[in-house]
A protein has these predicted regions:
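Rhodanese-like catalytic fold shared by cysteine-dependent sulfurtransferases
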Residues: 3-6, 17-40, 50, 59-90, ...
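Sec-dependent N-terminal signal peptides
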Residues: 6-12
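A solvent-exposed beta-alpha-beta segment
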Residues: 44
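Structural scaffold elements adjacent to functional motifs in cytosolic proteins
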Residues: 52-54
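Short, surface-exposed ligand- or partner-binding patches at beta-edge/loop junctions that are enriched
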Residues: 95
Length: 132
C-alpha cells in the first residue's frame, strides 16, 4: 500500500510540474482576432506600439501581407532574434496563414524572453486588407 501511495504521489508531482512548465511557456501569448489587428493597423498611434511579424515564407508574404508587417519566417525567427530584441518588453503580433506557424513562432519568442506576444488570426481565417 505504501509503495502504491509513493508511486501515485510521484506521478502526481510529475504531472503538476509538467503542467506548470507548459503554462509558463504560453502565459505570455494572447489570441488576437483579425478585427482587433485591423483596428490597430488603422490607428496611427496604436500601430506604433506594436511590431507585426508575418512568419510565413517569403513567397507567401510577397503574394500579400497585412500592412506595416515585417517578414521573418518561422524557420528563421530563432536565428534572427537579435533583429527584434528591442521589442522584448513591447507588444509583438505574429501572424501566418492559418495560425499554426504563428503559434510556433510565439512560443519561440516567449522562450527568448519576449513578454507580450499576440497571436493573430491567420490570413486565411480573416479577410484582411492585404498589400503586396
Amino acid at each position: 500500500m505504501m509503495k502504491k501511495t509513493c508511486i501515485f504521489l510521484s506521478f502526481l508531482l510529475m504531472v503538476i510540474f509538467s503542467v506548470s512548465c507548459n503554462a509558463k511557456s504560453t502565459e505570455n501569448i494572447i489570441r488576437m482576432d483579425g478585427s482587433r489587428l485591423e483596428a490597430i493597423l488603422n490607428d496611427e498611434t496604436e500601430r506604433g506600439k506594436y511590431l507585426v511579424i508575418d512568419v510565413r515564407e517569403d513567397y507567401e508574404y510577397k503574394a500579400g501581407h497585412v500592412p506595416y508587417s515585417i517578414n521573418i519566417s518561422v524557420q528563421e525567427i530563432e536565428s534572427r532574434i537579435s533583429e527584434i530584441s528591442d521589442w522584448k518588453e513591447k507588444n509583438v503580433i505574429v501572424i501566418c496563414r492559418s495560425g499554426r506557424r504563428s503559434r510556433t513562432a510565439a512560443e519561440i519568442l516567449v522562450k527568448h524572453g519576449f513578454k507580450k506576444i499576440f497571436d493573430a488570426d491567420g490570413v486565411s481565417k480573416y479577410n484582411y486588407k492585404l498589400e503586396k
